[in-house]
Amino acid sequence: MRQVDGVKLLGRLGDGVNELRGRLTPDAPMDRVTWFRAGGLAEVMFQPHDTDDLIAFLKILPEDVPLTVVGVGSNLLVRDGGIPGVVVRLSAKGFGSVELADENRIKAGAICPDKHIAAMAMDNGIGGFHFYYGIPGSIGGALRMNAGANGGETRERVVEVYAVDRQGNQHVLSNADMGYSYRHSGADAGLIFTGALFEGYPEDKAKIRADMDAVRHHRETVQPIREQTGGSTFKNPEGHSAWELIDEAGGRGLVIGGAQMSSLHCNFMINTGHATGYDLEYLGETIRRRVFEKSGIRLEWEIKRLGLFMPGREVEPFLGA
């Protein structure tokens, strides 16, 4: 049963779409976007050509139409009923740049892969970015969730962030404006990040390369990077590692439908080949329940879940005792 109707919604956008340079696609399959390779349709997907094109689109988008923004889909679970309204997917051509802005400063577009900013920093002897080499995804997602790993976090490097609001107005946010905390940004959820300016510090290139090699070796050794996965499934509770709690609760290797908690790293959920969004989310909530029953600790999702459930295939969130 279809939960969204992109052709009908596209008709509501009017003649203004003829002036857009980006691509509008009704009923766009989200399983081609997310790294899980699962989920339903985006009612309409818009891939803007650049920031000006994005602004032009937002100015003709009716206020009552839901708007969702996605990047490369690395940390995203889409439900099987699809995503109502418009999904904006930023393009590499318009938002994927990375360049040296000034001494020890790098400017990157929101869709720039995290590892590209790490490589740019290494090539120019700028320290403080090696941790990005081990984070899947793009800068936009890193800005939104304060992505971090291997001793570094996004909030340590951000100078300012460039964004567009729902009405098409542009904003420049300072580091303080972003309201960062662990795996979270307090910035307005309605803002679309288009890029950011980062700052590091002078460091020997050989030292940076060694740090990046260590990050790469760690990922290849302990993470299922060649599987269909969205990265870390749950945030680390204060004072604990999520994977240890999952392991102690018997979650390592647990399978539901086509979804599995990796046997290599049990805080990574994988699609074994035929998982639905329902399988993945149900597995995640099962893990949350098991961990709470074992340890009394409530795991919080790190993976973002979006969209509608199919009728009769809803997943109830585990709320604890």
Curated annotation (Swiss-Prot):
Keywords: Cell cycle, Cell division, Cell shape, Cell wall biogenesis/degradation, Cytoplasm, FAD, Flavoprotein, NADP, Oxidoreductase, Peptidoglycan synthesis. The active site is at R183, S232 (proton donor), E302. Residues 36-203 form the FAD-binding PCMH-type domain. InterPro entries: FAD-bd_PCMH, FAD-bd_PCMH-like_sf, FAD-bd_PCMH_sub1, FAD-bd_PCMH_sub2, MurB, MurB_C, MurB_C_sf, Oxid_FAD_bind_N. It catalyses: UDP-N-acetyl-alpha-D-muramate + NADP(+) = UDP-N-acetyl-3-O-(1-carboxyvinyl)-alpha-D-glucosamine + NADPH + H(+). It is an enzyme of class 1 (oxidoreductase). Its EC number is 1.3.1.98. SUPFAM superfamilies: FAD-binding/transporter-associated domain-like (SSF56176), Uridine diphospho-N-Acetylenolpyruvylglucosamine reductase, MurB, C-terminal domain (SSF56194). Transmembrane segments: none annotated. Pfam families: FAD_binding_4, MurB_C. It is found in: Cytoplasm. One of its GO terms (cellular component) is cytosol. Pathway: Cell wall biogenesis; peptidoglycan biosynthesis. One of its GO terms (biological process) is cell wall organization. Its cofactor is FAD. GO terms for molecular function: FAD binding; UDP-N-acetylmuramate dehydrogenase activity. PROSITE patterns: FAD_PCMH. The keyword Cell wall biogenesis/degradation applies. It comes from the Bacteria. Cell wall formation. PANTHER family: UDP-N-ACETYLENOLPYRUVOYLGLUCOSAMINE REDUCTASE. Belongs to the MurB family. This is UDP-N-acetylenolpyruvoylglucosamine reductase. It comes from Agrobacterium fabrum (strain C58 / ATCC 33970) (Agrobacterium tumefaciens (strain C58)). The lineage of its organism: Bacteria, Pseudomonadati, Pseudomonadota, Alphaproteobacteria, Hyphomicrobiales.
